[in-house]
């Protein structure tokens, strides 16, 4: 068995981590040991926040739908209930898009929901 020296692989590994840590503040972008921890933590935050992003956007859509619905004298929960009873299968993302960019179409959807509730 010949002796394995780690010079090339270690340098490559260090370089990879330090490239991932580019733009970090201070030692986090320069010192391998610190940069490695920073990159691992950044990966954890990124993984977690990819999940949180979905929740955040759903909350944003609900806020927008609620604001637009209240301009038509109906609450968000009543609107969703009415849409379910009317058999309208628009998701919250689409409803929020209508509420912001196509107010006439949103008004028609609200009328449909109100009719189903009456």
Swiss-Prot record:
The keyword Iron does not apply. One of its GO terms (molecular function) is rRNA binding. One of its GO terms (cellular component) is ribonucleoprotein complex. Keywords: Ribonucleoprotein, Ribosomal protein, RNA-binding, rRNA-binding. PROSITE patterns: RIBOSOMAL_L20. Transmembrane segments: none annotated. It comes from the Bacteria. One of its GO terms (biological process) is ribosomal large subunit assembly. Gene3D superfamilies: 6.10.160.10, Ribosomal protein L20. Belongs to the bacterial ribosomal protein bL20 family. HAMAP family: Ribosomal_bL20. PANTHER family: 39S RIBOSOMAL PROTEIN L20. Binds directly to 23S ribosomal RNA and is necessary for the in vitro assembly process of the 50S ribosomal subunit. It is not involved in the protein synthesizing functions of that subunit. This is Large ribosomal subunit protein bL20. It comes from Francisella tularensis subsp. tularensis (strain WY96-3418). The gene is rplT.
